[in-house]
Amino acid sequence: MDDRREGIIHSEMPANEAGEPIRGIQLWVNLPAVDKMTAPRYQEVSAENIPEVALDGGGKARIIAGTFKNVEGPASGIAVDPLYLDIHLTPGSKTVIDLPVDHAGFVYGLEGTFTVGAGSHGAESHGEGAQLVETRMLAVLSSGTKVTLLAGEKGARLLLIAASPLNEPVARHG
């Protein structure tokens, strides 16, 4: 990655000696208007530097950014104070994730299926019922401080990303 005053030029090329497909996830963060013209910044986080914690009900959460269960992720100094979790749920497990009160966010299915809702931070809090999320699907979380996740019969892997909303327009190219 090459940081330049005008922006960032991508030059990453993940190594994969086994020739198997690999997955990389990038999170681009919208900055508050006051920070829009600051120098671009890039943080690379390698897998071995990501802490993980056990989840009540089965599974684990890897903390990429933010603080979860008193464990801080390695990506830091981000303006919107994101919580960025890589969650692995065991088959049929149910867990509740506590979010900071002022955060809004989404979940994204990486593997398997899971349901978000069950009367907390998900769709059911609006009386619409829980929402099934499959691989490569995204579900926007409703307001609240808890997210209830229920894994499908084969388990699930998902990203949960939440941050302080800016309540500002998004400015493209700047």
Ranges and model annotations:
Residues 1-174:
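Jelly-roll (double-stranded beta-helix
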